[in-house]
Swiss-Prot record:
Cellular localisation: Secreted; Secreted, Cell wall
Keyword Protein transport part of the UniProt annotation: no
Originating gene: Hyd-9
Species: Flammulina velutipes
Family according to the record: Belongs to the fungal hydrophobin family.
Molecular functions (GO terms): structural constituent of cell wall
Subunit structure: Self-assembles to form functional amyloid fibrils called rodlets. Self-assembly into fibrillar rodlets occurs spontaneously at hydrophobic:hydrophilic interfaces and the rodlets further associate laterally to form amphipathic monolayers.
Alphabetical list of InterPro entries matching this protein: Hydrophobin (IPR001338)
Up-regulation conditions: A CT-rich motif, which is often found immediately upstream of the transcription start point of highly expressed filamentous fungal genes, is present at the expected position.
Record protein name field: Class I hydrophobin 9
S-S bridge residues: C52-C112, C59-C106, C60-C93, C113-C126
Main function: Aerial growth, conidiation, and dispersal of filamentous fungi in the environment rely upon a capability of their secreting small amphipathic proteins called hydrophobins (HPBs) with low sequence identity. Class I can self-assemble into an outermost layer of rodlet bundles on aerial cell surfaces, conferring cellular hydrophobicity that supports fungal growth, development and dispersal; whereas Class II form highly ordered films at water-air interfaces through intermolecular interactions but contribute nothing to the rodlet structure.
Membrane listed as a keyword: no
Residues making up the signal peptide according to the UniProt record: 1-23
GO cellular component terms given for this protein: extracellular region; fungal-type cell wall
Length: 131
């Protein structure tokens, strides 16, 4: 009699735990989606470096439109939603310093970017600058 009761309790617990496990969401996102508003024009016109705040000057290995496939994939993986896909996005960027010498320390694509808050991977709202 005790064995039957133990088996019944075990079966009940197994079913109850299975129901709780099935009710648990599988996709528990820890990184919420970030919407970024950029007011920089989507043009490729070059501006003088003096018209850009020093903290916004970046040296990027690549500068592409936000609508290009590689950039849209990276934005999607990072959970970044842009309101305007006509802006330029810099990839693998680092701040331009005067200490670097030469071209202001940039041998790639010098740009002025509005949003540099995603580390060195991506800068959003970029405009090419002449150093």
């Amino acid at each position: 009699m005790f064995a039957r009761r133990a088996i019944s309790i075990f079966a009940f617990m197994l079913v109850a735990l299975s129901i709780f496990a099935a009710a648990t969401p599988l996709d528990a996102r820890t990184n919420p989606t970030v919407t970024v508003t950029v007011t920089a024009p989507g043009s490729t016109a070059t501006i003088p470096a003096g018209q850009c705040n020093v903290s916004n000057q970046q040296c990027c290995n690549s500068v592409q439109s936000a609508s290009s496939t590689p950039v849209s994939v990276i934005l999607g993986l990072l959970g970044i939603v842009l309101q305007d896909l006509n802006v330029l996005v810099g990839l693998t960027c680092s701040p331009i310093t005067v200490i670097g010498g030469g071209n202001g320390g940039c041998n790639a694509n010098p740009v002025c970017c509005q949003n540099n808050s995603f580390g060195s991977l991506i800068s959003i709202g970029c405009i090419p600058i002449s150093l």
